[in-house]
A protein has these predicted regions:
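Short, mixed-charge aromatic SLiMs
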Residues: 6-17, 111-113, 170-175
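Generic detection of long, well-ordered alpha-helical segments
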Residues: 38, 79, 192-195
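Glycine-rich, mobile lid/loop segments that gate access to catalytic sites or pores
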Residues: 1-77
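Short alpha-helical "patches" and their helix-cap loops
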Residues: 1-7, 105, 207-211
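Internal helix-turn-beta structural module
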Residues: 155-211
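N-terminal, helix-rich and Lys/Arg-enriched segments in bacterial and organellar proteins
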Residues: 21-24, 82, 130-133, 138, ...
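Glycine-rich anion/phosphate-binding loop at the beta-strand->alpha-helix junction
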Residues: 54-172
């Protein structure tokens, strides 16, 4: 499942890193503006409209969660699951960054805070008490939900006058872009990010016919 996690400085509720229900994923797919919080979604929509009327654009973040991936899918080093997902995700226009699990927040954590402790639940499944690793350890799935976020830059094609150069004459100039351009590509990117995750994970699972 995938949702708009952030537009400009407005943030949606994040996925629960330990458990994402099928019902939640289906509900997001039936929304015209896929956010967990409808109130935040409306605020994002209004902010995009304000940027449009201001002849400007906005960036944002898409969060994706993949559930029911068995432990052991992937490979270490260069053929890791994170590598494969990131490679396809960066093929989506306007992508500028990706993070898995706790992402860049781990830089401010202690090892004792970042480490996800393992345990066996009542039905014998091996799980972790937290999911800072985002469902992938050493390039291989752990059995926990795979969670990652993708940052998209604001659309560069805006109607405001901007400084540029005339390459033919090597002189400075001004450009004003005409026509219809999206003030924010993030809503359109939601199914693209989900498809990228599906392709990357399926390609790894095909290497394991027993799955």
């Amino acid at each position: 499942g995938t949702h708009i996690a952030q537009i400009h400085n407005i943030k949606d509720t994040k996925f629960n890193p330990l458990e994402i229900s099928r019902e939640q994923i289906i509900a997001l797919r039936h929304k015209k503006f896929p956010t967990i919080s409808d109130k935040k979604g409306q605020a994002m929509y209004d902010d995009i409209d304000l940027a449009r009327r201001s002849l400007d654009s906005l960036g944002g973040i898409v969060e994706c969660a993949v559930t029911n991936v068995p432990a052991g899918v992937g490979s270490p080093i260069f053929e890791g699951l994170e590598n494969s997902i990131a490679q396809i995700v960066f093929g989506i226009p306007a992508v500028k960054g990706i993070e898995f699990g706790a992402g860049f927040q781990v830089a401010s954590m202690l090892g004792s805070q970042n480490n996800d402790e393992f345990y066996v639940n009542e039905v014998g499944h091996v799980l972790t008490k937290t999911n800072n690793h985002g469902g992938i350890l050493g390039g291989i799935s752990s059995g926990m939900p795979i969670i990652f976020r993708v940052a998209f830059k604001p659309t560069p094609s805006i109607a405001q006058p901007q400084q540029t150069i005339d390459y033919g004459n090597l002189t400075n100039g001004v450009i004003e872009i005409k026509g219809r351009h999206d003030p924010c590509v993030v809503p359109r990117a939601v199914p693209c990010v989900e498809a990228a995750a599906n392709i990357a994970i399926l390609s790894h699972m095909l290497d394991y016919p027993n799955f």
